[in-house]
């Protein structure tokens, strides 16, 4: 379940002390939360049976927003890969591996939802 996975990853990331990069980590946590909310809102639009008109009226630039979210995901994936390369701490490695896996799942879910809305 990606909801509990999100909570687990966010909790684990918030426990990490990455020294000078804790600001970066907080930024990543914020982006994770933002992506989760975005994924959930797309899912709700799909649940209302392809409620594209509602989505468009609420946010006329939803395609732009979708593109921006994919950019955020790509950036986070690169950031996770970079962190995996530089960390020696196994707790951090496991956390970043799980976060990376979760990002890939969320990217796929957002892609699936957006295809259903087009």
UniProtKB/Swiss-Prot annotation:
Belongs to the influenza viruses NEP family. One of its GO terms (biological process) is exit of virus from host cell nucleus through nuclear pore. Keywords: Host nucleus, Host-virus interaction, Transport, Virion. It comes from the Viruses. A motif (Nuclear export signal) lies at residues 9-18, 82-91. Its main location: virion. Mediates the nuclear export of encapsidated genomic RNAs (ribonucleoproteins, RNPs). Acts as an adapter between viral RNPs complexes and the nuclear export machinery of the cell. Possesses no intrinsic RNA-binding activity, but includes a C-terminal M1-binding domain. This domain is believed to allow recognition of RNPs to which the M1 protein is bound. One of its GO terms (cellular component) is virion component. Coiled coil: none annotated. Average number present in a viral particle is estimated to be 130-200 molecules. This is Nuclear export protein. Binds M1 protein. May interact with human nucleoporin RAB/HRB and exportin XPO1/CRM1. It is found in: Virion; Host nucleus. The keyword Transport applies. The keyword Hydrolase does not apply. InterPro entries: Flu_NS2. Pfam families: Flu_NS2.
